[in-house]
Amino acid sequence: DLHSTSRRQRQMCIRDSGVGANGTHKFKNKTELNKFFQQEGPNAANYILEEFVDGEIVTFDGVADANAEPIYAASHVTPDSIMEIAHGKKPMWYYVAPEISPELRKMGEAALKAFGAKSRFFHLEFFRLKTAKPSLGNAGDILGLEVNMRPAGGYTVDMLNYAGGLDLYQIWADMVAFGAAHHPLARYHRYCCCAGRHDELRYRMPHEELLKKYRSCLNAAPRLPEVLAREMGDQLYIASFEDEAAMQAFRRDALARPRE
């Protein structure tokens, strides 16, 4: 039953009808599970209970042709749990990777065929396991998570464009009009990352100093509306880099908090 299962492994639940990590909960023990049922009452029937998977999210994003084959594909990585980001326990941070691993590409292309993703944007999500999980796989294995027949949300398409020096919307328009890309695909392969700050928190490097230090790398620094700010941050920074070390240095500067 649910209670005996919760003693053996961490659980999480998500709304049967919802968007992203909104309305998700994680349970580490029977007490937390009981509290959830008491709070939700009959509404608990509107949730799906699942085993919690410790993994980073890797995606397969792009535009498919009439044969469900990618005209262009790229991948972005979210190292921390989206649920923990949404609940304010982790800062918003994710990045477009310059390359797609052969395993991820194989699984992504197979999913496009299986779901008949013809002549459309696609946004496929996978877990890359951080630790071995009985019955699921070993650390580093990739597992299917979610299929979306639409572009990735937020500023992700812009980030894909910055990372590759292309226009994914133009590629989509070419697909609609001609069935193939008539404009350049990726001109280069860079990292493009997104970091989010909350106004109520203090950070080691002030906003203006961060903008000045990374002015040659920043693509955009948008403010988010209140409806999105709780999960993603009030202030976003989107920047591109040639190598991972430079990107990680930016992450530290953008998200480091004052030492206690």
Where are these regions (language model features)?
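Single conserved hydrophobic/aromatic residue that forms the stacking wall/gate
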Residues: 1-10
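Short, flexible turn/loop "capping" segments at secondary-structure junctions
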Residues: 6, 16-17, 85, 228-232
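Alpha-helix N-cap recognition
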Residues: 7-8, 27-31, 206, 243
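Conserved anion/nucleotide-ligand pocket segment
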Residues: 11-26
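Short acidic/glycine-enriched loop/turn segments that link adjacent beta-strands
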Residues: 20-21, 55-57, 189, 231
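ATP-dependent carboxylate/phosphate-activation module, predominantly the ATP-grasp catalytic core
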Residues: 51-117, 121, 128, 132, ...
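Peripheral (often C-terminal) accessory segments that flank ATP-dependent C-N-forming ligase machineries
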Residues: 173-260
